[in-house]
Amino acid sequence: MIKITVPATSANIGPGFDSLGVALKLYLTLEVYEETSEWQVIHDYGANMPSDVNNFIVKTALLLAPNLTPHRIVVKSDIPLARGLGSSSSALLAGLAMANVLADMRLNNDALLKQATALEGHPDNVAPALLGGSVAAFYDGEQVYHAPLSLPKDINFITFIPNYELLTTEARNALPAKMTFKDSVAASAISNTLTAALNAGDFNTARVLIEKDQFHEQARAHLAPHLKIIRDTAHQLEIIGTYLSGAGPTVITLVSKDNATKLLKVLTNMALPGKLLLLEPDYTGLQITKNN
């Protein structure tokens, strides 16, 4: 049996639109068993999720290795679908990794990242999911350029997952068609300074900049009303660092372990319609183990 584990991811981290992301300790697991005459995909997603060759993971694997022998596979995931936690990226990477192993292609991480980004269109989820930790990345249509970001050792991610889905296409359609040159410069400067602050270990600056996005959050605010609610609540506790995870609707607040309990207690008492999780960064990324 081959076991492939891929972490959830939170993209953008505020102003790092389509370029910054972090892996979180919430996982999709793919178990690959015996060869079969046709692909068999066992999962608990319900009847709307294909259980044969039309499954997204299998289709992704066949894009990389079209002649791949069918197998029986089992998919388990704690990553909710269409919530802004990289569920599609984790599934995509699981499919590519399965093809890489079964077809003995021996692609390294750079090659896998290039394949994944070409399929996904941007690297902010697939890069941290593959490599672990927090990553800044850029794709020019041919190559993926990436570098790690530093996170405080005691950082926690208070994660509110609303009880409704938000498709990426809907969230993308909410974005402005263009920005003025002046606004683009300002938005880019905020993202650049956030990256520098994180790598300098200046979390006091970083957490302020996390809330100063000018690329997407304002345009998507009506799709994720809990962003303002949670941010305002955190501010009342003098906690700064709340942002919309990926395309939303999940909302994340970066906090120290000391502040995590305080904010989590208040948010729990608010009984928001969704799930609250206290997550830590995943620093290992995609993992593959083989058991005879």
UniProtKB/Swiss-Prot annotation:
Localization terms from the record: Cytoplasm
InterPro entries reported for this sequence: GHMP_kinase_C_dom, GHMP_kinase_C_sf, GHMP_kinase_N_dom, GHMP_knse_ATP-bd_CS, Homoserine_kinase, Ribosomal_Su5_D2-typ_SF, Ribsml_uS5_D2-typ_fold_subgr
Binding site for ATP: 80-90
UniProt pathway annotation: Amino-acid biosynthesis; L-threonine biosynthesis; L-threonine from L-aspartate: step 4/5
SUPFAM superfamilies: GHMP Kinase, C-terminal domain, Ribosomal protein S5 domain 2-like
Record flagged with keyword Ribosomal protein: no
A GO biological-process term: threonine biosynthetic process
Enzyme class: transferase
Function: Catalyzes the ATP-dependent phosphorylation of L-homoserine to L-homoserine phosphate.
Family according to the record: Belongs to the GHMP kinase family. Homoserine kinase subfamily.
PANTHER family assigned: HOMOSERINE KINASE (PTHR20861:SF1), HOMOSERINE/4-DIPHOSPHOCYTIDYL-2-C-METHYL-D-ERYTHRITOL KINASE (PTHR20861)
Name under which the protein is recorded: Homoserine kinase
Gene source species: Leuconostoc mesenteroides subsp. mesenteroides (strain ATCC 8293 / DSM 20343 / BCRC 11652 / CCM 1803 / JCM 6124 / NCDO 523 / NBRC 100496 / NCIMB 8023 / NCTC 12954 / NRRL B-1118 / 37Y)
Gene: thrB
